[in-house]
């Protein structure tokens, strides 16, 4: 049991520490405005994160079906499938993936609908770069902590389970 506890302590201490062996987090950015999309992808890149762009809710869903992403930044006001509808579908597909909702529509009804859907953060446009990057880092750190905690629990479960006789 001591080995498990030491390993658990080590994993929890390493959470948040960058390592070349760890994969770069992948952030999916969804915005129908090409200039905003390109700007956000550049901001992510300058901060050491990998970004994938999508210009619609349906394109976002197709990407999430084909690959894993660590975080989604989603615009609310988009044609065909708005960000709230896309968020509803995303929460069915990948419920533990954090979603940051980005919008020029900062009203209480939109905010309430977003929170009801389980959005992690709600950011109003125009975006403050530092604020957005801070929120992204917090969500990625929380995700990393959650994964580390799951690994520790799994390891403890394996070490304490006994074969049935």
Q: Language model features by range: what are they?
A:
Residues 1-26, 140-165:
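Non-catalytic signal-transmission and effector/linker regions of two-component phosphorelay proteins
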Residues 38-46:
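Charged docking surfaces used in two-component/phosphorelay signaling
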Residues 55-59, 82-86:
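Acidic catalytic/metal-coordinating carboxylates
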Residues 67-73:
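Active-site beta3 strand of CheY-like receiver
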Residues 78:
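Receiver (REC) domain active-site loop signature in two-component systems and cognate sites
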Residues 85, 106-121:
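Alpha4 helix (beta4-alpha4-beta5 surface) of REC/receiver domains from two-component response regulators
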Residues 109, 127-136, 144:
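C-terminal output helix
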